[in-house]
Amino acid sequence: MAGRHLLRACTALRLVNQNVAVRPLQRTMGTLKGIPTDDEQATGLERRALQALKKGKDPYSMLRPMEYAGTKAEPHIVPGISTKRLVGCLCEEDNTAIVWFWLHEGDAQRCPSCGSHYKLVHSELPH
Amino acid sequence: MTHQAHAYHMVDPSPWPLTGAVAALLMTSGLAVWFHFHSTTLMALGTVLLLLTMYQWWRDIIREGTFQGHHTPPVQKGLRYGMILFITSEVFFFLGFFWAFYHASLAPTPELGGCWPPTGITTLDPFEVPLLNTAVLLASGVTVTWAHHSIMEGERKQAIHSLTLTILLGFYFTFLQGLEYYDAPFTIADGVYGSTFFVATGFHGLHVIIGSTFLAVCLLRQIRYHFTSEHHFGFEAAAWYWHFVDVVWLFLYISIYWWGS
């Protein structure tokens, strides 16, 4: 009985396939030589990260952070997704004691130890 | 839904590290059981569990990277570091066996006749099958580089052809070494010569088989469109491993087959 069902399914499939245009065996990609590019095939977080980089943005902090003078005129720009963010200041190079403080939105704050300026700038959560 | 603000991969919980550890336990204790009680059941069970672990763990990595996109550039960089460190550890593994060989052969003891090769050992002619094997592996290094460039340039057919050729050359090497082992005039039990020869070349042969398997998996993935022209780290890792295997053979050939004959 199972054999009869299988035979019926096969004949039905064959009839359906006869009405469908024959697809070429080799999948054509944008690159006609057959290997896809990241642009065509990357997916998920990898795709989002690569597409953002192409637009000059770095929402996933993959690149080295920009360096700022830390003065009143050129404060350290700290991107944040909320109204406050923790900042750890290494006042001088090779310092082992990190100065931690909450940076709130609004006017630039100064590090309680070395006085360099930090400003919270709102940025969207990447999604 | 909460999304991460970093580019790293926080891996989902997985049972494979545990099954791998259990497999290691069963294989080692199974080895002891085999030695003392003449039963291979426990060891065989451990081996099966190990193979299942490897298959499922690496299948999951392919799913996470290729199908789900978790292998961002920083993640890929970490994988590169990982493979380089692993190959470095393998270099040290072989270094030990070369140390053993040179320790025995640079100052041969009176038991060997004070000479190298030791008295009574008929060595293999380095200019016969071993030289052919050297040519085979060097050629496979060329074909695997050809495969890499084909992938980078988007040439699907050439990539498949050159990768297949590389694997066939690997099989040819293994086949020739098998014949050499079978027809060798000395065995592993023939003093320190036999020990150093078969342990060093034997582990090398095992690594050739591992490398060929890795390349074969890459061939399967390439046929199924896993690789892109920019992102194909699985293939690069296999190619690095294959070059490492080739270099180890060159050292083996020069030290044991040629200088040691």
UniProtKB/Swiss-Prot annotation, chain B:
TM stretches of this protein: 16-34, 41-66, 73-105, 129-152, 156-183, 191-223, 233-256
Q: Name one GO molecular function term.
A: cytochrome-c oxidase activity
Mitochondrial matrix-side stretches of the chain, per the record, are: 1-15, 67-72, 153-155, 224-232
What catalytic activity is recorded?
4 Fe(II)-[cytochrome c] + O2 + 8 H(+)(in) = 4 Fe(III)-[cytochrome c] + 2 H2O + 4 H(+)(out)
Q: What is its EC number?
A: 7.1.1.9
Keyword Phosphoprotein: yes or no? no
UniProt keywords (A-Z) are: Membrane, Mitochondrion, Mitochondrion inner membrane, Translocase, Transmembrane, Transmembrane helix
Major location category of this protein: mitochondrion
EC top class, as a word: translocase
User: Which Pfam families has this protein been placed in?
Assistant: COX3
The GO cellular component terms are: mitochondrial inner membrane; respiratory chain complex IV
Asked if the record carries the keyword Lyase, the reply is no
Q: Which GO terms describe its biological process?
A: mitochondrial electron transport, cytochrome c to oxygen
Q: How does it sit in the membrane?
A: Multi-pass membrane protein
Q: Where in the cell is it found?
A: Mitochondrion inner membrane
Superkingdom of this entry's organism?
Answer: Eukaryota
Q: Which PROSITE patterns match?
A: COX3
Mitochondrial intermembrane-facing ranges? 35-40, 106-128, 184-190, 257-261
Family label:
Belongs to the cytochrome c oxidase subunit 3 family.
Q: What does this protein do?
A: Component of the cytochrome c oxidase, the last enzyme in the mitochondrial electron transport chain which drives oxidative phosphorylation. The respiratory chain contains 3 multisubunit complexes succinate dehydrogenase (complex II, CII), ubiquinol-cytochrome c oxidoreductase (cytochrome b-c1 complex, complex III, CIII) and cytochrome c oxidase (complex IV, CIV), that cooperate to transfer electrons derived from NADH and succinate to molecular oxygen, creating an electrochemical gradient over the inner membrane that drives transmembrane transport and the ATP synthase.
Q: What is this protein called?
A: Cytochrome c oxidase subunit 3
Q: What is the lineage of its organism?
A: Eukaryota, Metazoa, Chordata, Craniata, Vertebrata
